[in-house]
Amino acid sequence: MKKLLLAASIVYFASACLAEEKTTPFLSNSDTKIKLEGFYLFESGYIKQNHLILFDKNVTDNRKKLGFYTEVAFAATITKTINDVIAGAKIVLQPTTKAKTAASYNGSHIFIETSYGKVELGSPVDASAKLRVTGNKVTAGTGGWYRYALLDGQYMRYNGLKPDFDTNVNFYLESYSNSFDQINEKTEKARRLNFFTPKMKGFQAGISYTPDTANTGGNKNINNLTLQSSGRNGISVSRTGIKTFALGNGETMTINQNIRDAFSAGLTYEHAISEDADLKLSMTGEYGKPARRLIHSKVDGTTKTIEVLNTYKLSNLKAYNLGAVFTYGNFSCGASYSNLGKSLTSKEYYKVGRNTYYYNGAVAYGQGPIKTSLAYLKASRYKNTVNAVSLATEYKIMPGLLPYAEISHFQAKGKPVYYPEAPSKTTRGTVGLIGTKLKF
């Protein structure tokens, strides 16, 4: 408790030192504008969790319960307007710490906007991600308890395999990134084409096309699907969207969950019911075909050669999300339901279960500079479940500067999907967070 109070004192002092009002910088002439925007998060987290063994107890390399976390974004948007046509580019810089990859900050791309809508070329953020509504839209704090929890530690494993858990609402088209051997390996997602309609009577729609989710637009090695560099029909040596699981006796299952010819779309509706009441509804979805098959292979212990024993078809990507946010005066509430079905799974490996779905809800109350929220998440991934409840509060010292405190309790229950005979195990814990968000 003393350590958490010390961290709180540091965060408060830093917030007070930064409490000088600033506005978003603009540079402009008659038809060209440059907008600079950024985000910085500093957070301290304290966790207490059961069933952790040896170094699983460590939050960082040398500390068991206390850890710091930082997240940064900085972007410049350059626009030029000619005859009611806006053309521009958004350029996101790579920071020296964890990059914030939210849709509002991430995504270097070119765009053209007219009265007929907006086209984005090369954006890594798809239409469904930008138009999706979840309960977290109304919450205070960050909901970042999962950064400190370990749900697949040694206690939860069976025959060396980990159970699969989701700790927030995840969708395939925004899950993958490419490694550039830089400080941060989670900065780039697949490149795509986006189109958004203008808002008309409260409605707005968007659609995206992604040829290949392994194509980030900057891959250092496009030979992404080779069998030990000897062809294009075997096991990939890249980590982009690909997982390999050891089954014992030299056998492995390699699952390439990249997608080709992927489409995503969304539709939102906003309505002012009265002077004090507003409603926002959203429906989004994703569809695509698996890029490769699941590969069952075996490595010879002496020669180290790889023998492909069999390949299995993965199911198509089919996912959707339904969400709503209602605001009345100082009160807000949000809820969403997401279903990924059996997307990109095969019965030969996913023996315990193949379906994934999420329930997410939150209520919030704001009065002046203070906002408090209560949020709930249930995530079920292949019958492995996570339940989490978070209570958070934040205080706006000035526009853009938000110190916050948050406490979350979570429980995860499940087993590796390849072993239906494995016992289901449970781990639970509590995470306390204190931090500061700065936006400009």
From Swiss-Prot:
Signal peptide residues on this chain, from the entry's feature table: 1-19
SUPFAM superfamilies xrefs: Porins
One cellular-component annotation, GO: membrane
Pfam family, one: Porin_4
InterPro entries: Gram_neg_porin_domain (IPR033900), Porin_dom_sf (IPR023614)
Domain of life: Bacteria
Protein name per UniProt: Uncharacterized protein RP068
Organism: Rickettsia prowazekii (strain Madrid E)
